[in-house]
């Protein structure tokens, strides 16, 4: 894997290219790209995303969605945020995870992430993938997002590996099948 900063520079260039923005060369596949990185580079990636968000010279409309912040917003909407620590203390982490996974699913994430209208030049960048684990699984969320974001590119900042068929979070966890992403960004 090449140097993380060099790879992020390539992302900066890529998201502004008309072929990327228009989904050219994808053979009618969805325009979902995965940028894989070592989880130890998380702070470098976060800094890069923060810089992109304030870059007035970008030739695209970057829409950054931190999935962990989205998760917290969903918890706030459900008025359960304050109860979570007590629930974990009383019933344990496994029970809390089970209850949250039952209560908060892909539908809630899609509803929170969705915006309209999508405009030409929009790029949805998903961040916070490692932070939101284990409350949501990326392969399942991407499947759920596809019908709502088929007209704009989606770029996932992924702390792990994607080999074109399997997503493996943190380069350690059991891989999950995901076949629809077009490619990973080297």
Please place each PLM-identified region on the residue numbering.
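Short acidic, S/G/P-rich loop/turn micro-motifs used as interaction or catalytic elements
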Residues: 40-44, 70-71, 99-106, 130-134, ...
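Conserved P-loop NTPase "ATPase switch" module shared by AAA+ and STAND
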Residues: 119-135
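Surface-exposed peri-terminal alpha-helical interaction modules
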Residues: 90-94, 123, 149, 164-165
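Extended, basic/helix-rich recognition subdomains
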Residues: 31-33, 37, 41-44, 48, ...
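A short, acidic, amphipathic alpha-helical segment used as a generic capping/interface helix at domain edges
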Residues: 17, 105-117, 138
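Glycine-rich, aromatic-bearing surface loops/beta-hairpins
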Residues: 137-186
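Long, charge-dense
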Residues: 62-110
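N-terminal, charge-rich interaction modules
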Residues: 3-81
């Amino acid at each position: 894997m090449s140097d993380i900063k060099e790879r992020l520079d390539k992302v900066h260039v890529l998201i502004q290219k008309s072929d990327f923005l228009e989904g050219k060369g994808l053979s009618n596949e969805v325009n979902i790209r995965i940028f894989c990185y070592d989880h130890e580079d998380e702070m470098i990636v976060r800094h890069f995303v923060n810089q992109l968000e304030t870059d007035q010279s970008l030739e695209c409309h970057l829409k950054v969605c931190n999935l962990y912040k989205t998760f917290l917003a969903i918890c706030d909407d459900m008025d359960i945020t304050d109860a979570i620590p007590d629930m974990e203390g009383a019933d344990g982490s496994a029970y809390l995870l089970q209850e949250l996974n039952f209560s908060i699913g892909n539908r809630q994430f899609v509803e929170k992430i969705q915006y309209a209208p999508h405009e030409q030049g929009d790029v949805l960048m998903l961040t916070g993938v490692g932070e939101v684990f284990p409350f949501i699984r990326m392969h399942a969320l991407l499947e759920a997002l596809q019908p709502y974001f088929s007209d704009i590119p989606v770029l996932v900042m992924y702390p792990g590996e994607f080999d074109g068929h399997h997503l493996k979070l943190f380069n350690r966890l059991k891989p999950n099948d995901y076949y629809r992403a077009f490619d990973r960004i080297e």
